[in-house]
């Protein structure tokens, strides 16, 4: 006996299509690429920030170096068109005119006379004053007169800010000593008499204590003693 097995009953196993394998791995590769891009993007931003900071630091250093390299007179002259007095022709002309007038007055007196000596001393003071204007960097306008800079520029504090603070300190010192003197004598039998005839020992002791008047005023302000409630 022989058996015949039909071949049409054999069905091979289904194989995966090629397009399925390619499609199944494609999204994974895309996700990996996206993750890599996400990881690289912060690094690029950090590098960009570092580069920007370095460029800003370089620009700032160049500005500072250029400002130090500029001559002081040129930097100081860059204020409202003013020029250093020692370079101003009008300033030099005013000095010559002032000395010329004094020289003309000097010819009217004998060399050893008191007026002549006084005029010579005035001439020396005039020369010294003009020299100091040029030496300390004051700025002059087109009229040849020195101009005080009150804008708060640190290069010109010695012209207005420092003298102004010193004036306020001295004025406050005088006022504080006078106030302390009036407070000290108000319990006397004749306080008005001591206002007319100053008690020198008392005033002298208060005079030296008045140097610390800003500290004393602040302390009395905190204690409520700065203002008298009776007035």
From Swiss-Prot:
Q: Which SUPFAM superfamilies match?
A: Subunit III of photosystem I reaction centre, PsaF
Task: Give me the Gene Ontology terms describing cellular component.
Answer: chloroplast thylakoid lumen; chloroplast thylakoid membrane; photosystem I reaction center
Chief subcellular location:
plastid
| Spans traversing the lipid bilayer | none
Protein name per UniProt: Photosystem I reaction center subunit III, chloroplastic
Q: What residues span the transit peptide?
A: 1-77
What does the record give as the organism's lineage? Eukaryota, Viridiplantae, Streptophyta, Embryophyta, Tracheophyta
Species for this entry: Spinacia oleracea (Spinach)
Q: Keyword Transit peptide: yes or no?
A: yes
């Amino acid at each position: 006996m022989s058996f015949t097995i039909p071949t049409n009953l054999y069905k091979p196993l289904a194989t995966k299509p090629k397009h399925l394998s390619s499609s199944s791995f494609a999204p994974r590769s895309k996700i990996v690429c996206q993750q890599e891009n996400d990881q690289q993007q912060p690094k690029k931003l950090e590098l960009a920030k570092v580069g920007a900071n370095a460029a800003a630091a370089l620009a700032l250093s160049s500005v500072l170096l250029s400002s130090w390299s500029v001559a002081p007179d040129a930097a100081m002259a860059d204020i409202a068109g003013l020029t250093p007095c020692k370079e101003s022709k009008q300033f030099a002309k005013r000095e010559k005119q002032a000395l010329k007038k004094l020289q003309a007055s000097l010819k009217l007196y004998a060399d050893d006379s008191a007026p002549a000596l006084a005029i010579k001393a005035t001439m020396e003071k005039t020369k010294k004053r003009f020299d100091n204007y040029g030496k300390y960097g004051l700025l002059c306008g087109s009229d040849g007169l020195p101009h005080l800079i009150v804008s708060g520029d640190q290069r010109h504090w010695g012209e207005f800010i420092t003298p102004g603070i010193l004036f306020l300190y001295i004025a406050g010192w005088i006022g504080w000593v006078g106030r302390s003197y009036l407070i000290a004598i108000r319990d006397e039998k004749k306080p008005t008499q001591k206002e007319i005839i100053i008690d020198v020992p008392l005033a002298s002791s208060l005079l030296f204590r008045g140097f610390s008047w800003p500290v004393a005023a602040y302390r009395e302000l905190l204690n409520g003693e700065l203002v008298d409630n009776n007035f």
